[in-house]
Amino acid sequence: MSDLMSDLVSEAPLRLAVIIGSVREGRFGPVVARWFAEQAQQHGAFTVDVIDLADTPLPLELPPVPPALEPDMVRPDGMAGLTRRLGAADAVVVVTPEYNRSFPASLKAAVDWHYTQWQAKPVGFVGYSGGSGGILAMEQLRQVFGELHAHTLRDVVSFPRYYLLFDQDGTLKEPEGPAGAAKVMLDRLLWWGSVLRDARRERPFAAQL
């Protein structure tokens, strides 16, 4: 580990929100999220909060006034916990499947009901699907989070044909490659998360609408 990374790790841990983007019955997201959360905990620089969108009612109907114009808006019952946890995060990792070359509606609803909670924070992606490993969903999410003034990371973790990669108990059959990719992304999250956390403390982010 470089001296810079050692210094960053020695600082106060970054609060990392790991979001399970799918709420579909029979989804595989919790298995992937659990694996990634373990990687983040072993990294040593993060406190990890796994956010399962299945635990929060996410209406697809958006408010008449968008959150960008009314950040402190009253949100639907049951969403307060999600809003608080997103706001507290210093960095975010989205675990997403790929449905019809895109990401789930549940994830889009969670994103669109919030605005300031994403600003000036790094966002990483862990994707899983059939042949593409969620790459198409992750590329679309880059555009969405860029619009919300988040910084998306170049490095991702991808699980193509995920159903062949994990055992019945959710253990990766060959963990070395994915673990290496996760470490690269977590190192990037640590750098960006630390720098942007300091920046938000010194000069709160103000987007020009």
Where are these regions (language model features)?
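N-terminal beta1-alpha1-beta2 submodule of the flavodoxin-like/Rossmannoid cofactor-binding fold
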Residues: M1-A109, L172-K183, D187-L190, L196-L209
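Mobile beta-alpha loop/short-helix "lid" or hinge segments that flank ligand
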Residues: D49-L62, L148-D169
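Short, solvent-exposed amphipathic alpha-helical segments in soluble enzyme
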Residues: R34-W35, V111, Q140-Q143
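A generic structural signal for secondary-structure junctions
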Residues: P66, D112-Y115, G146-A150, S194
